[in-house]
A protein has these predicted regions:
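C-terminal nucleotide
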Residues: 1-13, 18-24, 32, 38-85, ...
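Metal-dependent C-N hydrolase catalytic cores
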Residues: 63, 98, 110-114
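Short gly/ser-rich anion-binding loops that grip negatively charged ligand groups
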Residues: 65-69, 100-107
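Glycine- and acidic-rich phosphate- and metal-coordinating loops
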Residues: 82-101, 134
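DPxDG-like acidic metal-binding loop motif
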Residues: 103-125, 156
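Glycine-rich active-site/cofactor-binding loop and its immediate structural neighborhood
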Residues: 286
């Protein structure tokens, strides 16, 4: 049995500018990290000649089909078609976190599945860039989904990264702050809004307003560049909360559906409880809100949100990996 273990991600700065519709004309930067929350894709063989189906897929729905073209899940169908695998395979998907909550789950699944099937078919490991490129090509070109580049890159590479994007391509740089990453990450909290939503519809609407939103996106990109300088030069992370707030204020202007009363209420509640800053993760309309809370404000913050509303996480450095059992 083969298993791909692929991290989810938290995006800090530059989100919304990682679309070629933007960076093909303006160089930009995205800052984010893979985290220690994972999606697992399991592969096993079975003898299909003894069954009335040739392929088994287990995810939110279960599929038992005779032909690859009959698979309803578009990513499964494309990846298996490209690898020319049409029988004797069973695949299970298991995620530590729900889908459609702003943690890049969909792209982490795509990266993990491509990694798994490549290892199964060719008995070889893909370089992180090749893996990210394959996932981006599949989602954006083959499936024509309205997604950016950062999710696939962070899932494939792993680590705390700056991603520079332009019409020439992208460059990934590991960020090594002068302050402790561990202590920094201990001040980060994900608060759940209780809302799951599909990012693609919101991203499509934001892309349609690109010309209207251009000045907002330019400023979001400028903030990401400022954050990169702070991460590489500052001796502490005092800047982080302020820049999160500035990014969130701009993100809400990209489309009226990015935020709503529930999200605004949670955000205001967290700021009143001592959070130095925060922003909604992902496309908008639901999912998790990231907050930065200094140690001397932690107790008040935790009294405000119970342990069913928030989750802690740590940075991870490995990206998508293959495990063999």
């Amino acid at each position: 049995m083969l298993i791909s273990k692929t991290p989810l991600r938290v995006s800090f700065f530059g989100g919304g500018t990682d679309f070629p519709e933007y960076f093909n004309s303006k160089k930009t930067r995205v800052i984010g990290t893979s985290i220690n929350k994972y999606i697992y894709v399991f592969q096993n063989k079975f003898h299909s000649n003894f069954f009335n189906h040739n392929l088994r897929l287990f995810y939110r729905n279960n599929e038992f089909v005779k032909k690859v073209k009959d698979i309803k899940h578009r990513v499964f169908r494309r990846v298996l078609q490209d690898a020319n695998i049409n029988k004797d395979i069973e695949i299970h998907v298991s995620s530590e976190m729900p889908s459609f909550v702003g943690l890049g789950t969909s792209s982490s699944f795509t990266v993990g599945l491509i990694n798994l099937i490549n290892n199964f078919k060719y008995k070889s490991h893909l370089h992180s860039k090749i893996l990210a490129d394959k996932a981006i090509f599949l989602e954006r070109v083959r499936l024509k989904e309205n997604v950016g580049y950062q999710d696939q890159i962070l899932a494939a590479y792993g680590g705390f990264n700056s991603i520079e994007l332009s019409k020439e391509g992208y460059k990934v740089k590991k960020i090594s702050p002068k302050f402790s990453i561990k202590k920094f990450s201990q001040k980060l909290y994900l608060v759940y809004t209780g809302i799951q939503r599909r990012a693609e519809k919101i991203e499509k609407k934001k892309i349609s307003k690109l010309n209207v939103n251009l000045s907002y996106l330019d400023t979001i990109s400028d903030i990401a560049n400022e954050a990169y300088k702070c991460f590489t030069n500052s001796k502490n992370a005092d800047f982080f909360g302020k820049l999160l707030n500035e990014t969130w204020a701009l993100k809400k202007k990209l489309h009226s559906q990015v935020s709503n009363d529930k999200i605004n209420n949670i955000y205001d509640k967290a700021i009143d409880a001592g959070a130095a800053g925060g922003k909604l993760l992902g496309a908008g309309a639901g999912g998790f809100i990231l907050f930065y809370v200094e140690d001397n404000k932690k107790n008040k913050f935790l009294r405000t949100f119970n342990d069913k509303q928030y989750i802690k996480f740590a940075f991870e450095n490995l990206g998508s990996k293959i495990l063999k059992i």
